[in-house]
């Protein structure tokens, strides 16, 4: 309302001021102020604007990760530092590219949601956040050439409209090999590609590929009596990137994005243990407005299946199905 009254005041004062000075020059100056300064800010009060939450709060992002992502000390640290550093860099050399790997239910999709919500008010529903699902948007191998053209046009058009666009590619392990290489020029160290800068855009890839390698490392630590929190990125990252690159069932199979080192971070999501499932269940109870009932928490967690068969250390579905299982106990 204060801004509205200020604009109205300028409009009411304009006739008398213009009479006292040069009508044309002052009129143009006033118009410039209204259109160049006030209008965009007034518009952004009622509609989402590109980069409207660019003053990303490190504390808010960390709180979202701490409160909602469990058993993923590596992912938390990488995401927090990479995203915060990138958004607060006025002149990045290239787009930020994150490749998130792990079994279903470990938090990959949830992290992409957290990132989107911390940058744009609309989160995944923002006009500046674009989600591609391999099996939905690129189903037919025979249409790869068409998909490549469409993908390039879509990204070019949206980055032209908003430099801070976010592109999320889900089910990379189900994407046809070679397709994702179409976006290679946009991820490289170019100031401009056909007159468009992609350096402030963000690309996030989600995949189950490489999950076996991540599990091997986590299981080795467990069998050695080491804490999972002792796992370092260097223990996994190189082996993970090689595994994904050589996986014929992955959209990254022999991809130039990996070969040219254009993926900034391969982010491993560790398989979840029994205690992490209980954390997920408690958060879901709270989100539904229920008091935490530890008996129900334990019963739901115990209904989940675990692997390896002998040791039963890790949940084979992560936290993905605990929410639906919780419905059984609250059928009112």
From Swiss-Prot:
GO terms for biological process: cell adhesion; chaperone cofactor-dependent protein refolding; chaperone-mediated protein folding; ERAD pathway; intermediate filament cytoskeleton organization; neuron projection development; nuclear envelope organization; nuclear membrane organization. Its EC number is 3.6.4.-. Coiled coil: none annotated. SUPFAM superfamilies: P-loop containing nucleoside triphosphate hydrolases. Its main location: endoplasmic reticulum. Widely expressed. Highest levels in kidney and liver. In the brain, high levels found in the dopaminergic neurons of the substantia nigra pars compacta, as well as in the neocortex, hippocampus and cerebellum. Also highly expressed in the spinal cord. The keyword Chaperone applies. The keyword Glycoprotein applies. ATP binds at residues 102-109. Glycans are attached at residues 143, 158. Residues 251-332 are annotated as: Interaction with KLC1. Changing residue 205 to I: In DYT1; increased identical protein binding; decreased ATP-dependent chaperone mediated protein folding; changed nuclear membrane organization; decreased neuron projection development. N-glycosylated. Keywords: ATP-binding, Cell projection, Chaperone, Cytoplasm, Cytoplasmic vesicle, Cytoskeleton, Disease variant, Dystonia, Endoplasmic reticulum, Glycoprotein, Hydrolase, Membrane, Nucleotide-binding, Nucleus, Signal, Synapse. GO terms for molecular function: ATP binding; ATP hydrolysis activity; ATP-dependent protein folding chaperone; cytoskeletal protein binding; identical protein binding; kinesin binding; misfolded protein binding; unfolded protein binding. It catalyses: ATP + H2O = ADP + phosphate + H(+). Residues 1-20 form the signal peptide. InterPro entries: P-loop_NTPase, TOR1A_C, Torsin, Torsin_1/2. Residues 91-251 are annotated as: Interaction with SNAPIN. PANTHER family: TORSIN, TORSIN-1A. Protein with chaperone functions important for the control of protein folding, processing, stability and localization as well as for the reduction of misfolded protein aggregates. Involved in the regulation of synaptic vesicle recycling, controls STON2 protein stability in collaboration with the COP9 signalosome complex (CSN). In the nucleus, may link the cytoskeleton with the nuclear envelope, this mechanism seems to be crucial for the control of nuclear polarity, cell movement and, specifically in neurons, nuclear envelope integrity. This is Torsin-1A. It comes from Homo sapiens. The lineage of its organism: Eukaryota, Metazoa, Chordata, Craniata, Vertebrata.
């Amino acid at each position: 309302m204060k801004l509205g009254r200020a604009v109205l005041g300028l409009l009411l004062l304009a006739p008398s001021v213009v009479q006292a000075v040069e009508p044309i020059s002052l009129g143009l100056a006033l118009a410039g102020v209204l259109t160049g300064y006030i209008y965009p800010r007034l518009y952004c009060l009622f509609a989402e604007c590109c980069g409207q939450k660019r003053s990303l709060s490190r504390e808010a992002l960390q709180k979202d990760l701490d409160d909602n992502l469990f058993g993923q000390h590596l992912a938390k640290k990488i995401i927090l530092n990479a995203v915060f550093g990138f958004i607060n860099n006025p002149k990045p050399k290239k787009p930020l590219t994150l490749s998130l790997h792990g079994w279903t239910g470990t938090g990959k999709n949830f992290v992409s949601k957290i990132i989107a919500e911390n940058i744009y008010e609309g989160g995944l529903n923002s006009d500046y956040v674009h989600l591609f699902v391999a099996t939905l948007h690129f189903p037919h191998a025979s249409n790869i050439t068409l998909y490549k053209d469409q993908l390039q046009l879509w990204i070019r058009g949206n980055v032209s409209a908003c430099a801070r666009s976010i592109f999320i590619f889900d089910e990379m392990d189900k994407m046809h090999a070679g397709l994702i290489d179409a976006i290679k020029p946009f991820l490289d160290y170019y100031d401009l590609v056909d007159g468009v800068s992609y350096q402030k855009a963000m690309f996030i890839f989600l995949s189950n590929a490489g999950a076996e390698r991540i599990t091997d490392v986590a299981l080795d630590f467990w069998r050695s009596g080491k804490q999972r929190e002792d796992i370092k990125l260097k223990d996994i990252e190189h082996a993970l990137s090689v595994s994904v690159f050589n996986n014929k069932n992955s959209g990254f199979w022999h991809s130039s994005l990996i070969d040219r080192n254009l993926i900034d971070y391969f982010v491993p999501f560790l398989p979840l243990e029994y205690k992490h499932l209980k954390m997920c269940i408690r958060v879901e109870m709270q989100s539904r407005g229920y008091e935490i009932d530890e008996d129900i928490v334990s019963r739901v967690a115990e209904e989940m299946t675990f692997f390896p068969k002998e040791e039963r250390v890790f949940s084979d579905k992560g936290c993905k199905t605990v929410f639906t299982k919780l419905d059984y106990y609250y059928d009112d």
